[in-house]
From Swiss-Prot:
GO CC term (a single one): pilus
InterPro entries: Adhesion_dom_fimbrial_sf (IPR036937), Adhesion_dom_sf (IPR008966), Bact_Fimbrial_Adh_Pro (IPR050263), FimA-like (IPR039458)
GO annotation terms (biological process): cell adhesion involved in single-species biofilm formation
Function: Involved in adherence to eukaryotic epithelial cells and abiotic surfaces. Mediates agglutination of animal red blood cells.
Alphabetical list of Pfam families matching this protein: FimA (PF16970)
Sequence similarity: Belongs to the fimbrial protein family.
Alphabetized UniProt keyword annotations: Cell adhesion, Fimbrium, Signal, Virulence
Gene name, Swiss-Prot/TrEMBL: smf-1
Organism encoding this protein: Stenotrophomonas maltophilia (strain K279a)
Localization (cell): Fimbrium
UniProt name for this protein: Major fimbrial subunit SMF-1
Main localization (coarse): other
Additional information: The smf-1 gene is present in clinically derived strains, including strains isolated from hospital environment, but not in strains of environmental origin.
Disulfide pairings: none
Amino acid sequence: MLAAAPLAANAADGTITFNGKVTDKTCTISTPGGKDFAVNLPTVSKNTLATAGAVAGRTPFAINLTKCSAGNVATYFEPGSTVDFNTGRLLNQASANAATNVQLQLLGSNNQVLPIKAAGAGLAQTNSQWVTVGTDGSADLNYYAEYYATAAATPGDVTSSVKYTIIYN
């Protein structure tokens, strides 16, 4: 006696088309410390992060570029396992003595929150700024990082990371 195997339906619900572009434009990342670097936020009191939505410790950082081709550049912060996809903020990855109810958020040089989410039509996240490469082939991509309370924070360590790619227009 043979059992009949279920047949797969041949009809698809839809098609997803992926589009992209590879360019010959390039820059050299010349940030002190190289392409991988740390941003050290100040130690803040839990009282400054006592309510959901409170922010503290805004700290500037820059990605410095040299030897760029003419045009415009921006930073694409890669969504990944360190990102809260609901908020676009960075999750606290501290494993021991971790502060709770604290995430990190990025802001552009215009002080607008920069959620780390998938790219939109402009190929940079909302509020990310395109910077025109200078005549000397350099560009500075300026940002801020700050603590963000999701509820009353508890004391402890906060650490996270995000991968980034320089994008060209």
